[in-house]
Amino acid sequence: MDMNKFDRLLDPAPLTLEMGYERLENGVLHIACRTDLHACTGEMFEWWFRSRPSTQQYIWWHPTDHISSDWLEVHDGTHIGSIHKVEERFSGSESKQLLIQFAKPDEFFSESAIANAIVNQHTSAIICGRGGESWQAPRNSLGQIMGSRLFHICRDTDWGCVLRSHFFLGWDLPSIGKSPHDLRNMIGDQVAPALLGHCYNEFTLLSRFLPSLFIAENRETHPVHLPW
């Protein structure tokens, strides 16, 4: 994928890379994962991030890979602007300490593409942000974490919602003079399949309890459909 065309992620037509990984010419590692979230909606998905999962809930999300969860620079009522401070593994690999700084969609997508996707029901949730490769990840003059980019885009369907997850690891490194060879050494090829498997597993696992949890926490505003 041309990394300057993020708007294409909001188009439900099949992408060249829906599930897999590739090394871009500048060395950035692109991982794509598609996950079917049965009985879930984009509203539920966005709420999960806005609720800022605790360590206990974070472990529910992925019982083998997730270790700890904390939140920094919290903004009430939204995940945007907050930083998720986590420790996790990718498919059982050595644990990593990471920062995820959630951002507004219009920082990465054009306003027209967002509006078109919403009007045409091509998207029901957009979760996006910047990733840091350590808890001491550097920031630029605007306070933005320097490192990677991540996108989770939901589209509601008759059976639930489909999730597109795309990661661009090392996104900021070329701009500070790192060569493609440098990026290969810093972010090895083995990271791609490990992150792909991790992503598919964590969101499949999330889909199995998110509907009940969402309704339990929002029963004053959403109907509860009893199974009997």
Predicted segments — roles?
Residues 1-26, 139-228:
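Terminal "cap-and-tail" regions of soluble proteins that handle hydrophobic small molecules
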Residues 2-83:
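Hydrophobic ligand-binding cavity/cleft-lining segments
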Residues 30, 38, 62, 66, ...:
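Histidine (H) residue identity feature
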Residues 30-34, 124-135, 149-153, 160-166:
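Ordered hydrophobic segments in well-structured contexts
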Residues 41, 93-95, 188:
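Alpha-helix initiation/capping motif
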Residues 46, 58-59, 133, 157, ...:
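Short, low-complexity intrinsically disordered segments
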Residues 52, 97-104, 178, 182-186:
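Surface-exposed flexible segments
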Residues 66-143:
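Glycine-rich portal/gate segments that line the openings of hydrophobic small-molecule binding cavities
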